[in-house]
Amino acid sequence: MEGGCGSQWKAAGLLFCVMVFASAERPVFTNHFLVELHKDGEEEARQVAAEHGFGVRKLPFAEGLYHFYHNGLAKAKRRRSLHHKRQLERDPRIKMALQQEGFDRKKRGYRDINEIDINMNDPLFTKQWYLFNTGQADGTPGLDLNVAEAWELGYTGKGVTIGIMDDGIDYLHPDLAYNYNSDASYDFSSNDPYPYPRYTDDWFNSHGTRCAGEVSAAASNNICGVGVAYNSKVAGIRMLDQPFMTDIIEASSISHMPQLIDIYSASWGPTDNGKTVDGPRELTLQAMADGVNKGRGGKGSIYVWASGDGGSYDDCNCDGYASSMWTISINSAINDGRTALYDESCSSTLASTFSNGRKRNPEAGVATTDLYGNCTLRHSGTSAAAPEAAGVFALALEANVDLTWRDMQHLTVLTSKRNQLHDEVHQWRRNGVGLEFNHLFGYGVLDAGAMVKMAKDWKTVPERFHCVGGSVQNPEKIPPTGKLVLTLQTNACEGKENFVRYLEHVQAVITVNATRRGDLNINMTSPMGTKSILLSRRPRDDDSKVGFDKWPFMTTHTWGEDARGTWTLELGFVGSAPQKGLLKEWTLMLHGTQSAPYIDQVVRDYQSKLAMSKKQELEEELDEAVERSLQSILRKN
């Protein structure tokens, strides 16, 4: 079972980890309340809510917890509604009533690079270079998602539903209507089953409709373009369009219809301003954990997240959604393989797809559906990248409905390719087991053809275990110049039930303060020599009070490695002015399997990463068997 990390929070009999946030800003209170009843039951909850003038929804991921909302209250204000809170607390049937605080969540659609209106009279399929790159808009031929191979094999996303968690979907759009799944859709901003975008003169709420078209736009209907998984179904989950986000709305959206929705696509997150450190709150963490444990009949909901649009001034490891083990974080490249100007780099990004963010050529953007039956060529940002990945994953799920959420991450690592991607800052490197990765692009660009072929024969990976590899609790000063270097020796819980031999995710849970948080640089090196940049410089972050409080920095760069040995943590400052800092805690969290995940997989391509990894696993198994035999002989003698 998956749990969180950080401080613990108990609800509905389950123990979860909570990311701790602190802010100097005054809180904003919303018209949403988290309510727990002494006697559980939806009829009881409806009666209690009605008596107090509230609407009500049951939270699907927790027993006895309900979402009460009051349309007569202001959606956002600086003071608590003490009258309504006390009214609820005085009711003997109510055990707890907590008014929800509001916080910012931003869509990850980069500003338009070119505002020229494009004539949309003709279908846009030939302009969808991310599907078939023949060199359109001065792109690099062949640099695409390789969907052609998947389609030729007969995989188009049939039987798979993707939920777009966003500002709504124009489900009346002729290119989306046929594939729209109304049963799996809901509007959490207005509390009704019709997630249609709210009208604005500037079409601000076109974000979700554009993302939906990338995934599920119908094929061969002479309208706009074609979705990556054009026979998949798309569900609209409207949840972004209100003055402030709340934990209860995020949690409800992430846990909506987990037996109907297979993949959740999120192109939003905390503000990408280069100085925010934020992530999911208690209820949302619980909903995510519930999703990967129970969604899709126990195979786990698949959460796809845009890595962020903060550019070189930000680091996506400061985003608790993109850096979560339970999400697949996706970055973007432009059509010639270069990085987009808005791309954030971090060690938690798993792979990349495509968007625009450098070129002014009007056809270099992502072609997709737009509001009110229109089409656009101007979709961009990592907002465009995440839905493309969701579409590729839908093709893989059609090829093998038994894939778990972890299987999808393994397939992503094994089938993504460097192709012709080019990062001007970070070199491509190989980790301790030979897997090639990049600090910005992850393990490379998704390859739909390779993924569906491997998915067809895929055997579910072994059980996952969690090990606290060790902890440094003594405060250590970070010098103004040079680095603080700490080491941890771990056996990865060998000899115990939770022994982790083959790594998936690694977290460094860190508490640290600095006179200027943005100048802090943190690196961690594994026993097999793989260096992960956990935190890079963020020049706009001038925080000197909050720091990081039990923040789980995550890396995927040590995937497949042996965790046993010495881990090294390096902390220092990068900047023109001298700074001071204090590391209060470093806890090493190891997540992975005891048995080799690829040793029983079918290899079709003997040049593939799977073939290389399986060969290495077989050699390691043989070496360990020989070692055990020698030790047995020595003991007998």
UniProtKB/Swiss-Prot annotation:
Its biological purpose: Serine endopeptidase which is involved in the processing of hormone and other protein precursors at sites comprised of pairs of basic amino acid residues. Responsible for the release of glucagon from proglucagon in pancreatic A cells.
A cellular-component GO term for this protein: extracellular space
Keyword annotations of the record: Cleavage on pair of basic residues, Cytoplasmic vesicle, Disulfide bond, Glycoprotein, Hydrolase, Protease, Secreted, Serine protease, Signal, Zymogen
Domain P/Homo B residue range list: 460-596
CDD domains: Peptidases_S8_Protein_convertases_Kexins_Furin-like (cd04059)
Gene Ontology terms, MF aspect: endopeptidase activity; serine-type endopeptidase activity
The keyword Disulfide bond is assigned to this record: yes
GO biological process terms held by the UniProt record: enkephalin processing; insulin processing; islet amyloid polypeptide processing; nervous system development; peptide hormone processing; protein autoprocessing; protein processing; proteolysis
Pro-peptide region(s): 25-108
UniProt-recorded name of the protein: Neuroendocrine convertase 2
Disulphide-bonded residues: C224-C375, C316-C346, C467-C493
Signal peptide: 1-24
Annotated organism of origin: Rattus norvegicus
Pfam families cross-referenced by the UniProt entry: P_proprotein, Peptidase_S8, S8_pro-domain
Top-level enzyme category: hydrolase
Origin superkingdom: Eukaryota
GTP-binding recorded as keyword: no
Enzyme Commission designation: 3.4.21.94
Location(s) in or outside the cell: Cytoplasmic vesicle, Secretory vesicle; Secreted
